[in-house]
Amino acid sequence: MAAVQVVGSWPSVQPREAPREAIPERGNGFRLLSARLCALRPDDSSSARTEIHLLFDQLISENYSEGSGVAPEDVSALLVQACRLVPLNQNHLVSKVSQLIHHLLNRLQVIVDEQHLDFLLAYTISAIHQCSSWTHREILQALAALVYCNGSKCQKYLPELLGNTGLLMKLSDLAQSDPEVRRAAVHCMANLCLSVPGQPYLEEPYQNVCFQAFLTILQSPKSSDMDDITFCMLLQNALKGIQSLLNGGRMKLTQTDELGALLAVLKKFMFHGLPGLNIEMPTVLYPTPLPQYDGRTPIKPQQSESSASRPTLNKKKKSKVKPKKIQQGEEEEKESSGEIEAAPVTGTGRVNLHEGNTWCPSSLGVQSLPLDGSGAAEKDGVSSSFSSSSWKRVSSSESDFSDAEGGMQSKMRSYQAKVRQGALVCFLSTIKSIEKKVLYGYWSAFIPDTPELGSPQSVSLMTLTLKDPSPKTRACALQVLSAILEGSKQFLSVAEDTSDHRRAFTPFSVMIACSIRELHRCLLLALVAESSSQTVTQIIKCLANLVSNAPYDRLKLSLLTKVWNQIKPYIRHKDVNVRVSSLTLLGAIVSTHAPLPEVQLLLQQPCSSGLGNSNSATPHLSPPDWWKKAPAGPSLEETSVSSPKGSSEPCWLIRLCISIVVLPKEDSCSGSDAGSAAGSTYEPSPMRLEALQVLTLLARGYFSMTQAYLMELGEVICKCMGEADPSIQLHGAKLLEELGTGLIQQYKPDSTAAPDQRAPVFLVVMFWTMMLNGPLPRALQNSEHPTLQASACDALSSILPEAFSNLPNDRQMLCITVLLGLNDSKNRLVKAATSRALGVYVLFPCLRQDVIFVADAANAILMSLEDKSLNVRAKAAWSLGNLTDTLIVNMETPDPSFQEEFSGLLLLKMLRSAIEASKDKDKVKSNAVRALGNLLHFLQPSHIEKPTFAEIIEESIQALISTVLTEAAMKVRWNACYAMGNVFKNPALPLGTAPWTSQAYNALTSVVTSCKNFKVRIRSAAALSVPGKREQYGSVDQYARIWNALVTALQKSEDTIDFLEFKYCVSLRTQICQALIHLLSLASASDLPCMKETLELSGNMVQSYILQFLKSGAEGDDTGAPHSPQERDQMVRMALKHMGSIQAPTGDTARRAIMGFLEEILAVCFDSSGSQGALPGLTNQ
C-alpha cells in the first residue's frame, strides 16, 4: 500500500510522487470536509471540540483512491488549519490531529511544501514538549511523515531535534520507558536522514550523531518490556537510517572501529530469527585474513518442526486475505516472509540442508537438476536489484498471514525476515561506500571456508542462501555476495591450491583457494535446491561474477566442469531470465583466463551432454541439417582448417548460440517471455543478444575453435546487421570485429598458431567480400544510429592486411572512401572510430606507399586532432603516430620516390599539429611526441635547409625536451625519450653543433639518474647510446656530463621506493652498461682524463656490473641491447680496439688506465667462461 512507504518500513527512499492531475468527480468528499474545517474558528467549547473530532474522523475514514484529485497544497493547507484549531492543552485533539497528519500524508503520498512545513514542524515539536506522554507516539508518527524527504528543509529545527539534549535523542535513548515511543523517535531520525537528489544533505555532525544513535540501538539487546514485533520494527528503522546515511549522505566509514562495529551488527542481524541459528558476535569485527570465531549455539527445539525449519515438501501453505488498515507501513506490510515451500527436486529439498551437511556437488547428477522452475515460490517478487527502493516487494502470493492458529507465528517470521533483508541491504550500501581493499580485510567474516573435519562451518552469506526460508532474503544475500565478488580479481589472484603437499600452517593463498572452492560448492547446492525462478537467476548471476574473478589457472581442475555441467539444463528453462543468465554464465566461463584447456575440452563435449527437455520455448539443440553441415565453403577440408588437435567434434555452444540467434523458436512464447516483441518468431531479444555476446567471447578466447565456423558466423552477422533492431545490429558488428581481430592475431609474427592451422587468406577474402557485399556498408552510413556506425568502423578496421590487398579494387575503394567520408561526421563516437581505422589502414603494406592515400589520411587525421572531444583527439594522435611510422618504413625502402613526392607543406603542417598536441592531455600527448620523433627522423636534407623548417624543428625539439622533463605519466615520458632517440638517428640534423644539443642531452641525463620509473630510465639510457659519431655528442664537457650521469645512474640502479620497479633493475643496468661501452668506443683523447677520474672512484662498481652484463642473457627489453653474450663481448673488444687506436699525448696515463680496465674485464670474463679470445693481440697495441 502507498502508506507503507513513509513510516516504519523498508520499501523505498524515493520521494513520493505528486498525485495525478485532478479528476473532477473524485476528491469531492475531501473538498467538502476541508471547506467545513476551514470555516471553523478556534473555539474552546465542548461542542466545537466535538465537531472538530467528528470532522477529523471523517477525514481519516474518507476513501482516498489513487488519483483522487486532491492537490498537495490543499492537503498542506488543511493540516495547517487543523493545527490552528487544536490548542496544545487538548491532549485528545492533539492526538487526533497527529493521526490526521500521519494518515493524509501517507494515504495521499504528499510531501509538505516548505511554506507550510515550518508551521507544522513548530506545532508538532511544541506538542511533544507540552502534551502528555501518552500522545507522544502519535505526535512522533506525524513528525516522521512531515520530515519524510524534507530533511534539507528542517535545518533550523535540527539542533532542537538532534542536538545533545534534542527531543529525538532523548526519546530514542535506551532509558526511554515506552518502547513504542522509542521506536517512533528512531523512525523520525531515519526519515530525517533520507536524501533527495539535488537537495543539501544533513551536515556531518548530525550525520555522526544519527549514525551513533542507530548503531547503539543495533548493539543493544531487546529490553524486557518490548515485544518481538516492536523490536523488529525498531531494528528495521535503525538499519534504514544507516542505509540512508551511506547512500544519500555519502557518509564515509574511515575509522576501523566504526566500520568493524557496523559490520558486527550487520552480520548479527543478517541471521535474525533464522530457524535453528543463534549467533553471538563480538562488538567489533577487525580486519584479518584468518577465519573469525562465531560463537554459535543452536536454538533448542521449542517450536514445532514446521516452524523451526524449512516447511516440509508435502505441506501446503495456507493463506487468507484479511482486509486491514495498515498505518504508515510500520505496523504491517502487506507481505509475509515469503516462506514458500521448495518444489520437490528428486526427493531432496532445502529442508534437508542442515548445518552439518557436507553434500558435495560432485554427487549431483545433471538429471536431478530443476529444469522446471515452476511452483508457488516462482511468484515471489524478487527483483534482480535490491537497491534502497527494493525492500517493498508486495505480491498476491505474499498477501497476509495464515489463520489464527499460526497467524502470530507467521507474522513474527515475516518481521524477522524483513530485519534480515534490511541488514543485507544495509550491508550492500556499506560495501559501496568503502574501498574494496578495506572490504576484503573482512572476507573471512562473510565468505565460507572449507570446514575442518568434525567442526561446524562458520555462518556466512551462503548460510542464508542455503537455509533462509524467504526467497527474497536468499536473493538479497546473493546480491550482497555478488557485490563482494565484483572487482575481486586482484584479491582472489593470490589463491593457489595446485600443490598437495602438507604444511605446518595454512598459507593465505590456500585459505583463499578454499573459500573459492567452497563458494562453488555452496552456490551449486543452492542452484539444485532453489525453486524460485527469480532467485535461480540471482544464483546464476552470482556464479558468473565468481567465475569472472576466480584464478582458475592457479586452482585444481574440475571447478569449471562442475559449473558447466550443472548450468547446461538451465539453458532450456521456461523462464527467459534464467535462460539469459545461464548464457551469461557460460560467457563468463569462456572468457575467464582464456584459453583454458579444461574449457577447451568442455566446448568439445557432445551437443546432447547434460541437456534435457524442459518444454521450454527455446530452439532445439539439434538444428536443421544446414546448420549441422561441416563449415561452409570449399575451404575447410581442402585447406586443413579444423577444430584444434584435428578433432571433428563440433562445438555445441557455438551451434547453440547460432540457433538461438537465427532460428525461429519451436513453439509459442511462454508467459515469461512476454518481454519479447509481440508476434516475434525468434527468441526474446535479451536471449539473442546474450548468445551473440557468447559468440564474441568465444571468438576472442577460443578463436582456433571458432574459425571452423567462419563462414556460418559470417551469415549470422549479415542476418543480424540486416535486422531492424539496432541492438542486434550492434552486437553483430561487435562479433565481426572480434572475428577480424582473431584472424589478424593468427598472422602476427609472434602468433602461436601453426601456418597450417591459420584460416587461409583466400577464405578470409571470401569472408570479407561477403561482409562488404552485405549490410555492412549500409550500417556504416546509418547516421540515425551513430553507435552502430562507430562499431561498424571498428569492424572495418579489423580486416586482415593480407586479405585487404586481395579484395576487388571496388571493395578496397569502398572501404577507403567510406572512412574518409565518415571522418567529417558530427558525432564524436563515429569520428573517433574513423580516426582509429585510418590509423590502421596507413600501416597496410598495399596502402602505405600510396602517397595520395597517405596524404588524404594525414589531412583527415590532422582535422580530427583539432576536435573538441578528448577521445577523438586521442584516437587521432594514435593514428598520427602510426602514419609517421609508415613514413619511417617508406624511408627505409630502396625506392626514394615516396620521400620525394610527399608534400613538404604537409610535413610542416603535421609538425605544427604534433607540437600543439604535445601540450594536450596525457592521452593525446603520448602519441604526439611519438609522431614528433618520427617526423624529425623523416626530414630530408632538402627540408632542413629551408628557412621555413628551421624554426619548426627548433620548436619540435623544445617540445620533446619539455615533455621528457615534465612530471607526466610514465607512458608520455617513455615515448618522449623514445622520440628523442629517433631524432638522434637523423644524420641531417645538426646534432652536436645546434644550440639545442646540450638541452636535449641534459634532459636525458636528468631522467636516467632521477626518474622514479625505471622503464623511462631504460629508454633514456637507450637514447643516449644512439648517436654513432663522437662529434654528435658535442663538447668535451658535454661528453663528460653524459659519462658521469650514466655512472651515477648505474650506482643508483637499485634506488627506488616502489617495490614493483625492482624487476626492471637488471634491464636498466644492461642498458646503462651498453651506453657506457658505446661512449668508450667513440671517445676522443680529450675525453679520456674525465673517464679515468670516474673509473678511479667507481671502477670496481662499474666493472662488476659490466661483467654481469657480459655474462647474462637476454633481458627481454625492447631497447635494442645485444642479446647474446658473444655480441656483448664483441662490444667490449671493439671499445678496447678503439682505445688502442687513439693517439694520446706523450706521458698521458688515461688511455693506458682505461685499456687496463677493459682488459681486466675481458680477462675475468675469459677465466670464468673459458672463451677463446684474442687478448694478447689487443693488449700489444
From Swiss-Prot:
GO molecular function list: RNA binding
Segments annotated as HEAT repeats: 159-198, 452-490, 515-552, 558-595
Matches recorded under InterPro entries: ARM-like, ARM-type_fold, DUF4042, HEAT6
Cell inner membrane listed as a keyword: no
SUPFAM superfamilies in the record: ARM repeat
Disordered as annotated region, ranges: 292-347, 371-390, 613-646
Pfam families to which the protein is assigned, alphabetical: DUF4042 (PF13251)
Gene3D superfamilies according to UniProt: Leucine-rich Repeat Variant
Chain intervals with Basic residues compositional bias: 313-325
Start-end of Polar residues biased regions: 300-312, 637-646
Keyword terms of this UniProt record: Phosphoprotein, Repeat
Tissue: Amplified in breast cancer cell lines MCF-7 and BT-474.
Phosphoserine: residues carrying this PTM: 336-337, 399, 402, 643
In-chain residues carrying the UniProt-annotated modification Phosphothreonine: 618
Role this protein plays: Amplification-dependent oncogene.
Note: 17q23 region is one of the most commonly amplified regions in breast cancer and therefore may harbor genes important for breast cancer development and progression.
Record protein name field: HEAT repeat-containing protein 6
Species this protein is from: Homo sapiens (Human)
